Amino acid sequence: MGIGLWVRTGLLMAFLTGLLVGIGYLIGGQGGMIIAFTIALFMNFFSYWFSDSIVLSWYNARIVSEEEAPELHRIVEKLAMQAGIPKPRVAIVPTLVPNAFATGRSPEHAVVAVTEGLLRILNRDELEGVIAHEISHIKNRDTLIQTIAAVLAGAIMVLVNFARWSLWFGAYDEDRDGGNIVALILAIILAPIAATLIQLAISRSREYLADETGAKISGKPHALASALMKIEEAVRYRPLKNGNPATAHMFIVNPFRGVDFVELFSTHPPTEKRIERLRKIAMEMGIIF
């Protein structure tokens, strides 16, 4: 892993740890701060070593063998070979909402996950385009930062919800400085926005890069563009409602569109702009669509 990635990963962990500790202090003073710091250390450790298992468990994703999904495995193996990385494990998510994501701390410990809905609506070329995009995230080593951000942002949301509960049900110490109560209310409002902005910062530019790299790996930018249009349309009609919004930036298209996100804080670039860029890449490759 390059020095730049180590630095980015360290800064991300430090910032999110600080956010967790700050919220912990506002909830429970010094004791809350110590508990939050302990939780942060625990989450940092597990988000690095077991991030893939954590994210897969959130979506009940199941690792499938070559016997269970031979065609899918063949596609993943071919594209991984073309990208020059080890073949990732393959998982299927039991939801009809079409989407895909990659996770894992390194190319040697990566997983490509696709939903049942994706397998239903895409043809083979489109599926290759999507998987090439996800393999690009693995090749570019985006998956480590994406997954750590998802796990720690999820922890922040749990703490924020606990803080909200403590205010609503009177668990917060009323004898403490009223300024802390105001600060806690502000933290409840602003912490989720901060977590979303972090996801936005690490996601948008990397999505463009994964589109470009994936198009070159598969040689089918037109197929990826077609897949993005299909996924976008399906997500607008039926957004994912049972997942964890902290993982939105990990998917090829934000699956929570229309639920709690607005375009200003979208974790992904507009699909129309991504398709336009893919058109330019296709023209450079001598492909017109």
Curated annotation (Swiss-Prot):
Binds 1 zinc ion per subunit. One of its GO terms (molecular function) is zinc ion binding. GO terms for cellular component: plasma membrane. It is a multi-pass membrane protein. Its EC number is 3.4.24.-. Gene3D superfamilies: Metalloproteases ('zincins'), catalytic domain. The active site is at E134. Belongs to the peptidase M48B family. This is Protease HtpX homolog.
